[in-house]
Amino acid sequence: MTRQQFLRLLTSGSVSAIAGPFAYPQRAAASDRGSHGAPTNDQPLPTNDQRPTTDDQRPAGFPAGVTKAVTAFIQHSRLDDIPDKALVEAKRCLIDGFGVVLAGATVHGSAIVREYVKTFDVATRGASILGPERLSANAGHAALANAASGHAMDYDDTQLSSTPDRVFGLLTHPTVPVLAASLAIGERLGVSGRKFLEAFLTGFEVECKIAEAIKPDHYLRGFHSTGTMGTFGGAASAAKLLALTPTAIPHALGIAASMSSGIRVNFGSMTKPLHAGRAAENGITAAELASRGFTAGDDALDGEWGFFQVLGGGVDLPRIMTTLGRPYSIVDPGVSFKPYPCGSLGHPTMDAMLKLVTDHDVKPDQVAHVAVRAGSNILNPLRYKTAKTELEAKFCLPFMMSSILLRRRAGIREFTDEFVASAPVQAMMANVETVFDKDIEARGFDKMRSVVVVQLKDGRTLTQPSDERYRGGPENPFTRADLHAKFTDCASLVLSADRIKRALDAIESVEKLANIRELVSALTA
């Protein structure tokens, strides 16, 4: 096209002719489109002349009502109607969640967030920030700080997928954003333990079902689902505690949809846990604004411009429309609890190395070379070939292997900047290689599969495949004793032994508390 032709087209108003096949479809006016609906994953967006003019003319693939279904669930959920098994599992998640919040509050990134929160001089400081010092803030900032702490060590629980077609069979870290939002609003209002538990389970279920329903492309595009899905969980739990009306709840969801974010490029930095913090804070902001009459689209999860389509390329309706609370995701398929404070994709490999080292009594000075063979579902997210900081170490297989070889453990006292940067660790990491294995890749992404191969200086080669029934997962779950031990280890960085016992007692009897502030008191240093 010549410059003269371009100018003639521009002055004639035919801009779409210039863009040709690369033009973005223009949004139809409200009167020219249906009020809900997203295309299926395989269906392209309709052109302007194909778009429906009324709901009755909506084409197949543009279903209505996901936002309405979520709204109805939030409005009508009641603790009395929730199965006992869900209540038991909720308490297990709370034990794990509060433990990792307390431990995570001791790391440098969490301290920076608290210093940021301190700069706000607000009249109402009705919510506590857990950690090594007594602090309070408004609900949003308290939730920001607590949730950022809860994800700071990458030690928080993981939602399991109900089907093996989702990448890794894992979806998001569900507890921390919802816990932080529920605690902040609950403490400010002085609600009972039952109301707190009701809100926690409501937000947890909304977050998990949205994570189930969105297409896997959401995560593959680079979104961090803890930040994106957690925003809806925080909004749902806050909406429940604030008793939002059926009119206000969709607006809260719409605001949350526009505030939902988090990208995977920030894995291995302080910003990854900030995603969880912002999810909790933004969820509260969405509910608080909606409670005051602030508006948003009332179909934000639906439609060609709705959350599912824009951020994930579509929605699997059966995973959400008829499954909210049927069963509760916290029960089936459940969650996995982490035995190590790092990316869960490395845990089966770490257990394999631990078994190899203990079975053969391998000493660090015997090791000549280590190879970890795995598929891209493990090697791509655990992207660091070597680590200089504890944040990088959480996504670095060579560090994970080195820690177990050197200390036969990899806990919160190993994931420190000092240990990661130490000469023995750096030297051992130089001997660890990650290898893409096409045979493992061909078996699919539904499991976390790997093989550890250790060559010793005496010429022996030791091999250990990972166990797909990984510790903390559905086939090898944490016991009550395991959870108590993890909580004690985490909380001991902040609380005395007496307070740790008091906190555990309060969590396990949370539904009996007249005021959730009793639990906050038990968790406060």
Region locations from a protein language model:
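Membrane-embedded hairpin module used as a gating/binding unit in multi-pass transport
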Residues: 314-358
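N-terminal core-entry segment
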Residues: 9-27, 31, 55-333, 378, ...
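Twin-arginine (Tat) signal peptide motif
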Residues: 1-7
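Intrinsic disorder/low-complexity segments
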Residues: 29-57
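A short, charged
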Residues: 485-517
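Short, well-ordered loop/turn and helix-capping segments at boundaries between secondary-structure elements
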Residues: 12, 276, 285-296, 313, ...
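Intrinsically disordered, low-complexity Ser/Thr/Pro/Gly-rich interaction regions
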Residues: 343-497
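Flexible, glycine/charged-enriched surface loops at secondary-structure junctions
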Residues: 84-85, 108-110, 294-302, 359-370, ...
